[in-house]
Amino acid sequence: MTQDYKATLHLPATDFPMRGDLPKREPAMLERWEREGLYAQVRANAAGRPLFVLHDGPPYANGQIHLGHAVNKILKDIIVKSKYLAGFDAPYIPGWDCHGLPIEIAIEKKFGKVGVKLDAAQFRQKCREYATEQIDLQRRDFKRLGVIGDWDNPYKTLDFRFEANEIRALAKVIDNGHLTRGVKPVHWCFDCGSALAEAEIEYADKLSPTVDIAYPARDPAAIAAAFGVTLPAGTQVAVPIWTTTPWTLPASLAVSLGAELDYVLVEGPADRGQPRWLVIAEALAGKALARYGVEAVVVHGHAKGAALDQLLLAHPFYAERDIPLILGDHVSDDDGTGAVHTAPGHGQEDYQVSKQYGLLERYSAAQINPIDGRGVYLPSTPPLGDTVLAGLHIWKANDVIIDALRDTGVLLAASTMEHSYPHCWRHKTPIAFRATPQWFISMEQANLRADALKAIETVHWYPSWGQARIAGMIDGRPDWTISRQRTWGVPIALFVHRETGEPHPRSTELMRQVAERVEQGGVDVWYTLDAAELLGDEAGDYDKITDILDVWFDSGVTHEAVLVDRGLPKPADLYLEGSDQHRGWFQSSLLTGVAMDKVAPYKQCLTHGFTVDEHGRKMSKSLGNGIEPQEIMRTLGADILRLWIASADYSNEMSLSQEILKRNADAYRRLRNTARFLLGNLHGFDPLQHLVALDDMVLLDRWIVHRAHELQEKITAAYARYDFAEIVQALLNFCSVDLGSLYLDVTKDRLYTMAEDARGRRSAQSAMYHVAEAFVRWIAPVLSFTAEELWAYLPGEHSGNVLFATWYDGLAPMPADAALTSADVDKLLALREQVAKVLEPMRANGAIGAALEAEITVAADAQTAARWQPLSDELRFLFISGDVTVTAASTDDIFVSAQPTTKAKCVRCWHHQASVGSDPRHPELCSRCVSNIEGPGEERRWF
């Protein structure tokens, strides 16, 4: 009867759970981290190290966090934690953007607009309370993601100190000569009732009317003369324009041509029986005339646009208004007619060219911009014939204007087209350019544009195309409109002269005095402040500005209001946000940083893509393809979410679906099972007593430490360049190939069958200990909860948190002058694969049931055979086969052959050996197992 030898084996044993059960375990860990003050402990432990500052871009304090928030915060957390492990002190101060329209809208829905139920001060207080509640909700979910930071002391743009620092920052911008005021066309949202910054605009398709409108010549003969022709009697001349915004025609003050463009004078459609010639860009004449129903292009003359400069036209429906032909660089012959109707109140290029020609001084503000903040024509807007425009909304006016012009002879063509059009990012509604008095940060008057473009070149951009993207945006952007006509925000805090409109000559000094008061009482102080307190006898000559600052200025000055205020270095080491922030926070921060200090506020800038489903579609409620981070954490755990984020190529769109989550859960199990196997085989191992020195290790153990060292070099370099997908892939490959398919499989025999304290067994345990110590650190930035759990189960002293440690220093490469080098091991592993290929068909045809039932013969050249023959007694352990014989042969190739063994099987180690039964005390054991149980035990040198 077979004796039971199980008690003589050293099988794996660990209390580290096989199942992660993350949704239950993670909250308990969070409670402990909170209770123990983990972030403060980690900072204290890192005191005195070099600083690495990842500055948090503030999410808006409104609504629950979504998957994009989770991606952003987890990427930041991975970097921060990897920096602690790399030997840095990496403070992370989370922040929130708290002012602005979405919060105002939320309060308006509940209490109405200012003045209905609440006065302005009460309204601001409700906004403050609402934002604070939203911060608490978001903070809870951010913590649940496993993100560590100064959650008890975040920065909030609504804090009195921040608001005061923002006013101080604006004063610095003004001191450096960047502030200007003017009546300029700005992006205007009629729903917001306020100007918008570039970053508050998004583009969407819109169906717009298109019209070709003829502007009749005041002196047709003069225009004909510019083309070198004489006009036949009774022939009219007109210049047609093409536009998608008929509502701007009441504000039309000029028609722009391209100075160097070629124009032709062509026969157009008759005007109520009278012949009419048209001035059209030569490249567009055929297309334009086709729109007007004219088949043949009959050309009467050619001229450059410059030849027509300042000749006069008549407005198409305000006959008394002279419309000069002017020259503008913005005119092209790509589409339309080559002539651009110019309304300086409704377009930046129109404004600039009109200013050059002195047109703005000839007209009233109401003529330049005849619409109010709601998008309605002013009462002073003249009618179009019998059609009243005053009080009409511009989006309704398009059709009204077209209908009114149909029988006048000036409407040459009308149609519709779908095109990309600017919309408000909050309301998703079309916006318009509208000339209003605003405060701007000028891109030119103190060289801000040029300085910003230089600063961009000093920054390391991830991905690299980010540099060209933001440079293009800076190069083409208009002045930054920083004023808003709203209630909830930081006041511009300027006093302006009642007659001249000029800021007080001591403006920045006064602003700093206001900031001192705001720091104590918040922004309400500005509205209750008696100007005489600061201005004395001058108070009667000055008004307080009631405009507030653009929220992008709020977040744009965090480098000053947070970093400098908290004693952190500036520029920050890294800004990290979504790819839309090239036109948002990256840009506003860059402009304020350069305006204040002439340097970019960041050394590195990293962007990530947006989340989409497995088909590449944007996640939305309407499609039903959204996946909320809260649901992932509730069902799978935060570590699965973190693993997906780390493994995705975040430089592009990031796909997520239930199937992708399942694959990540499977990958997580592979990592966890590897850790559990390592821990199981470290049972009874104390590194203080049992650690075998690297030079004394069995060859294969020394090799796996060498491989771990190579992997750590790769992983730490990848963390340093933020390539987390490479890290995850390398870890999974190491677990599957180096450990799972090779090392752990081969060493089972030693670990299970050798005497507990045998050097060969302790050597394997030592190698596994080194791997486990390194492994827990490798995964810690990504799998924060699992790493914390694993840390507690490692042998030896492991107090505190894995983030108290740095990258493991117990690994080392194999010496190049060793008797057998890593290259020799690689050749033996290639031989192992060759053996496996030979055994595969033998298993398939039933010649053997397992590799242990096959005896192997390896034939190699004399030099190789001589190198391998000393190992031949142990090669069976590497191959997990029967006995191995190495022979020399006259060949350059290596040949492997195998045959079924006829030797008996040892019931303890399962090896087939001739020595089975040689000891009468253990008739079913091989001599090796008898020695391991009763005697001195076997010796292992190689495998």
From Swiss-Prot:
The EC number(s) attached to this protein equal: 6.1.1.5
Task: Tell me which PROSITE patterns the record gives.
Answer: AA_TRNA_LIGASE_I
Q: Please list the residues that bind L-isoleucyl-5'-AMP.
A: 577
Residue interval(s) of motif 'KMSKS' region:
618-622
User: Which terms under GO biological process does the entry name?
Assistant: isoleucyl-tRNA aminoacylation
Keywords from the named record: Aminoacyl-tRNA synthetase, ATP-binding, Cytoplasm, Ligase, Metal-binding, Nucleotide-binding, Protein biosynthesis, Zinc
Question: What residues bind Zn(2+), as annotated?
Answer: 906, 909, 926, 929
- Positions binding ATP in this chain are 621
What the protein does comes down to: Catalyzes the attachment of isoleucine to tRNA(Ile). As IleRS can inadvertently accommodate and process structurally similar amino acids such as valine, to avoid such errors it has two additional distinct tRNA(Ile)-dependent editing activities. One activity is designated as 'pretransfer' editing and involves the hydrolysis of activated Val-AMP. The other activity is designated 'posttransfer' editing and involves deacylation of mischarged Val-tRNA(Ile).
Q: What's said on domains?
A: IleRS has two distinct active sites: one for aminoacylation and one for editing. The misactivated valine is translocated from the active site to the editing site, which sterically excludes the correctly activated isoleucine. The single editing site contains two valyl binding pockets, one specific for each substrate (Val-AMP or Val-tRNA(Ile)).
What is this protein identified as? Isoleucine--tRNA ligase
| Natural source organism | Xanthomonas campestris pv. campestris (strain ATCC 33913 / DSM 3586 / NCPPB 528 / LMG 568 / P 25)
